[in-house]
């Protein structure tokens, strides 16, 4: 029983950190604002993740997500860029460009 608890803890920790590995573009959202999300297809050369509040509330808490949608760029576990929608529930128009610029800076 003790080993089972340890295994579950390790799996939880590893799945939590996996979405931050390498260069990762992570979008935090909810089903009712799907139309306000950005497409992550442009970033398919990197790790991309889309988390919904109804399914991954623990990630929202851990990353201190206040507004949805929010996009965070991670590099090897470190938060590089965080773009929030604010009370409008709309991400800024230059969100994709800002992410691309930050990725280019990481790669240079």
Task: Give the location of each predicted region.
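Sec-dependent signal peptide recognition
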Residues: 1-9
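Hydrophobic h-region of N-terminal signal peptides that target proteins for export
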Residues: 8-17
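Local sequence-structure signature of Cys/Sec-based thiol-disulfide redox active-site neighborhoods
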Residues: 18-49
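Solvent-exposed loop/turn segments at secondary-structure junctions
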Residues: 31-34, 58, 79-80, 89
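Short, charged, surface-exposed secondary-structure boundary motifs
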Residues: 59-62, 83
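Structural micro-motif
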Residues: 63-75
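Non-catalytic, surface beta->alpha helical segment in thiol-disulfide oxidoreductase systems
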Residues: 73-108
């Amino acid at each position: 029983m003790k080993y089972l608890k340890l295994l579950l803890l390790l799996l939880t920790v590893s799945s939590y950190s996996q979405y931050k590995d390498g260069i990762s573009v992570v979008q935090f959202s909810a089903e009712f604002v799907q139309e306000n999300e950005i497409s992550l297809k442009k970033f398919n050369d990197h790790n991309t993740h889309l988390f919904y509040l109804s399914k991954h509330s623990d990630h929202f808490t851990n990353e201190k997500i206040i507004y949805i949608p929010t996009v965070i760029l991670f590099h090897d576990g470190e938060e590089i860029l965080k773009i929030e929608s604010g009370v409008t529930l709309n991400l800024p128009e230059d969100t994709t460009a800002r992410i691309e610029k930050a990725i280019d800076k990481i790669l240079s």
